Amino acid sequence: EEERICPLIWMECKRDSDCLAQCICVDGHCG
């Protein structure tokens, strides 16, 4: 398992389910 950097763009985050939670937090939408 390799650590992945999630995209900062929300539309891209939604496509990356493996990192969705992290992306949401990075984008300021944690919760």
Curated annotation (Swiss-Prot):
Residues carrying the site annotation Reactive bond: L8, I9
Keywords: Disulfide bond, Knottin, Protease inhibitor, Secreted, Serine protease inhibitor
Molecular function (Gene Ontology), one example: serine-type endopeptidase inhibitor activity
Signal sequence interval, chain numbering: none
Disulfide cysteine pairs (residue numbers): C6-C23, C13-C25, C19-C30
One CC-aspect GO term: extracellular region
SMART domains: PTI
Gene3D superfamilies: 4.10.75.20
Keyword Disulfide bond: yes
InterPro entries found in the cross-reference section: Prot_inh_squash (IPR000737), Proteinase_amylase_inhib_sf (IPR011052)
Any one Pfam family match given in the protein's UniProt record, by short name: Squash
Main location: secreted
SUPFAM superfamilies named among the record's database cross-references: Plant inhibitors of proteinases and amylases
Cross-referenced CDD domains: PlantTI
Highest taxon, organism lineage: Eukaryota
Subcellular location field: Secreted
Tagged with keyword Transcription regulation: no
Purpose: Inhibits elastase.
Record remark on domains: The presence of a 'disulfide through disulfide knot' structurally defines this protein as a knottin.
Similarity comment: Belongs to the protease inhibitor I7 (squash-type serine protease inhibitor) family.
Protein's name according to its UniProt entry: Elastase inhibitor 4
Organism annotation: Momordica charantia (Bitter gourd)
